[in-house]
Amino acid sequence: MGKAAVEQRGVDDLVLMPKITEQDICANLEKRYFNDLIYTNIGPVLISVNPFRRIDALLTDECLHCYRGRYQHEQPPHVYALAEAAYRGVKSENINQCVIISGESGAGKTEASKLVMQYVAAVSGNSGGVDFVKHSNPLLEAFGNAKTLRNNNSSRFGKYFEIHFNRLGEPCGGRITNYLLEKSRVTFQTRGERSFHIFYQLLAGASDAEAQEMQLYAPENFNYLNQSACYTVDGIDDIKEFADTRNAINVMGMTAEEQRQVFHLVAGILHLGNVAFHDGGKGTAAVHDRTPFALKNALLFRVLNTGGAGAKKMSTYNVPQNVEQAASARDALAKTIYSRMFDWIVSKVNEALQKQGGSGDHNNNMIGVLDIFGFEIFEQNGFEQFCINYVNEKLQQYFIELTLKAEQEEYVNEGIQWTPIKYFNNKVVCELIEGKRPPGIFSLLDDICFTMHAQSDGMDGKFLQKCQGGFPSHLHFRGMNNAFSIKHYAGEVTYEAEGFCEKNKDTLFDDLIAVIQESENRLLVSWFPEDTKQLQKKRPTTAGFKLKTSCDALMEALSRCSPHYIRCIKPNDNKAYHDWDATRTKHQVQYLGLLENVRVRRAGFAYRAEFDRFLRRYKKLSPKTWGIWGEWSGAPKDGCQTLLNDLGLDTSQWQLGKSKVFIRYPETLFHLEECLDRKDYDCTLRIQKAWRHWKSRKHQLEQRKMAADLLKGKKERQRHSVNRKYEFDYINYDANYPLQDCVRSSGRDKEATAFTDQVLVLNRRGKPERRDLIVTNEAVYFAMRKKKSGQVVYNLKRRIPLGEIASLSLSTLQDNYVVIHHNQYDMVFENDKKTEIVTILMENYKMSGGRDLPVNFNDNITYKASNGAQRRLTFSKNESASAQPSIKKSRANIQIGIATGLPKETDSSPPNWTPSGGGGGYGGGRGGGGGGRGAAGGGRGGFGGGGGGGYSQPVAQAQPVAQVPQPVAAVPSAGRGGPGMGGPGAGRGGPGMGRGGPGMGGPGAGRGGPGMGGPGGPGRGGPGGPGAGRGGPGGPGAGRGGPGMGGPGGAGRGGPGAGRGGPGMGGPGAGRGGPGAGRGAAPAPAPAAPAKPQVKALYDYDAQTGDELTFKEGDTIIVHQKDPAGWWEGELNGKRGWVPANYVQDI
């Protein structure tokens, strides 16, 4: 990001700021806030500023998928980036993760938690369980959220939801744990606030029949709702929300009867609140309305038992309660029923989650997300705010312990060089509230509640006196009249003491439980399983005690996870978009400890791990720690040091402690992870490549077997084509985008390409023209290339759908002509890979149409030209046309003469062929059977077996007409055409298949290693047939073979090796290898050069490789060597190279 952009938009990560002060942090957050960049990082900690409106650009599916598989530094700050880091930790490292979201009420914590769930559901591939958590939100918000002065939809409970994952990283269920429900809100609300949403939803959304059945009225008529004089909320439609709640209840699988009973209990709580008491005399209470009331005795009297459980005689007394005690019992009953109802609803959600998760492979890994009410500071703060702020204080302590205190202590213990950072440790505040020795505020409060249980008046004052006496000089406590204040991490808060003791009692006596257990509402009875036979109850637990217990359980759950933090900031109290209250935000920056957090991040280390764990994860990045067997035998610390040194990381980026590796910068860790991803990716590619190679080779063998069965007994064969490897793509079609565009111009862009090469097509005048042939799974394409303004352009001349091909025709001789018969007009072309072309056409024809393609063999073939005229191809034997066919044209007839080839009965089936073979067979790898342009033992490649352990041996062949020495049998070899027994380097091989690859082979196999050569054959090898790529060199004539073990030197130079392979052990005359052992005996002197014949070019030809000649039609070329395989060595304008014999004619 440029300087101008930083000035306007701020930096993404506060660690990168040049100057670190609270003012600079606030200014950076403000810039980003007004640019709708609501997220900012402090290393791995995310700061989220509530925009009070939806920012669509941050919530699209495209935005979400930009973070998938990316590290945090690769994309702008976002909840998605943090969620991705948590998901990666679970999936890659099998470490439980948790996301702790903190901030004031209304700062956007719940929305942030929803985005975490949304992201995990989107990227994990199995979002059923996660979606269930999302669907539970309307239900849990209805029963657990309420309007407060700061937030219209404030969570009044803590929610810690876990998403469980199986070994594949897929969600397999989950669990929700609720903490600290603010049940006192059921019976009392501050003015301007509301009780839980469900009460108002039920009153507004119930049907007329339900309202009549449950005697529902306007909220003003219920004492539990009319205290705050707030019944509606701007932006909340209670009728619509009730419909959403009903739908969520159905999704969670609650029965209709369970739903009915739940809503009846909600209504019953409201009616219970309308029960009023008056003084009945002598300090006892009486029900104000004398209508029969089932709970009257339970509310007016408390049952006391004397004598104890072990006494011989026990007495029971009904002790009347005063008005305050009766009202307290009523409210305690209402709060308890509601609290247990909420717990039951959460349990139903968990049951639904478990059903979604199924009983599959659970790996016990999970991501937990904590969404809990934020720190609260109101004009009047009571017991509820005290409890909420205590929990937030504990969360802040947890944050400090992990990110500030523990980190610095670890550096000291590990002997890491470190500059200590000062910070405020709020442990002293936590001890003030929860301490036991000396007793903290909760302990003092419980003591007052136990000693003054029979009265309410004066309890709060007594409690306040005890606090003032217990903390007379505490730096974080200050007593006042009827109130006290605590200096929290978020600031000083004054709490009104009134109501503390009453709300802390939270007492429900056995007599009330016994009455409930007699209810006809079986659902309600199931929520109170207490054994009331033990009539002498122990001292009841208080709200404060339960709160501390729940908070300890929460801290324990978080401590088992690797934490991620989202620190939410509320920019204003008006809930307005683009409204920045500098004072409010600065205060939050202070109490969230962002300044200290930035300082620690800048001075500290972003990552640390035990030596064993670090080495286990990253050892494959160095051959010294990975090795052949993947094990490091030395000490783990030494292995880590070796690994980091081999990676070339500067020592300023990492340090080794006593038991751990410390990485200073996140970018360094990201670099390690990226290296690991690349390594895994490369390994995956190798495995895929090996598999595809095996499949491809197996497919080639099947095709060659098909071709052998098709041609055997029907057509004479060319020597070089018998064992030629099929390469399919001879013009590098995959990289030829202009040609691809040309093919797609027909409107078919999803066809799979099966074969590509250049062919010579006979036009309507019988003259050959070069075309690019492309065979796909659906059609055959012929394209013409020409130069235009120095650029090669393509023009699609014809597309023939495979289903419209009537038949194919070939002669019975060894020529390379193929005729495709079509109802419009036929296509006649020549190509030295005709067998491969016909095989592929037959295969794809049957796959597309389900029937066999007719193939005719005839030496008199009638075809229809593009102008509609009938033409005839007549084939006959002409032994003088051994180098290339002779062609004579008449008006409607073309006579083609060709020398005798291998007998029709020649079997070109792969050796040791079995239909299931291919794992290590014949002709695989680069430069397998006849790879490159080489014929058997001839110059550019010869016979060769496939790579990967294939066994190679040449096919027995009949003696050809041309006096070409036969190759010696190949032996098994490995790698890139390892040593093989090569025959004499006779000529330059016939047309072969592109680039020969590594393989086990004899002559011409792979990039042949040295091979044992036979006696040198005369002359330089003849050219291979036209085809792209280069085969690997083999035995005799392999590569430009180095000196080797050979027989006695033969005359002349051996044929060149296939492709441009490395040196091979050639016999005399093989490759360029010297004769004899070592460099062998001196070769025989070359005979006097005869007069060189000349030829005339019939067509233009562009060289395909560096050792070929480019020429134009009519050029005169001096011929130095003719090879019956079809390539002649010529010279033009002082440059020597190879020319295709069928492009020239003798002068």
UniProtKB/Swiss-Prot annotation:
Annotated region (Actin-binding), positions in chain: 551-573
Keyword ATP-binding: yes
SMART domains assigned to the protein according to its UniProt record, in alphabetical order: MYSc, SH3
Keyword annotations from UniProtKB, A to Z: Actin-binding, ATP-binding, Motor protein, Myosin, Nucleotide-binding, Phosphoprotein, SH3 domain
Renumbered residue ranges of the record's region Disordered: 901-954, 969-1089
SUPFAM superfamilies: P-loop containing nucleoside triphosphate hydrolases (SSF52540), SH3-domain (SSF50044)
Alphabetized CDD domains for the sequence: MYSc_Myo1, SH3
Domain Myosin motor: from-to ranges: 9-677
Stored PROSITE patterns: MYOSIN_MOTOR (PS51456), SH3 (PS50002), TH1 (PS51757)
Gene Ontology cellular component terms for the protein in this record: cell leading edge; cytoplasm; myosin complex; plasma membrane; plasma membrane bounded cell projection
Membrane listed as a keyword: no
Binding annotation for ATP: G103, E104, S105, G106, A107, G108, K109, T110
Short name of one Pfam family: Myosin_TH1
The protein's role, per its UniProt record: Myosin is a protein that binds to F-actin and has ATPase activity that is activated by F-actin.
PANTHER family cross-referenced by the UniProt entry: MYOSIN, UNCONVENTIONAL MYOSIN-IE
Extra remark: This organism expresses at least three isoforms of myosin I heavy-chain, encoded by genes MIA, MIB, and MIC.
UniProt name for this protein: Myosin heavy chain IB
Organism: Acanthamoeba castellanii
Gene name per UniProt: MIB
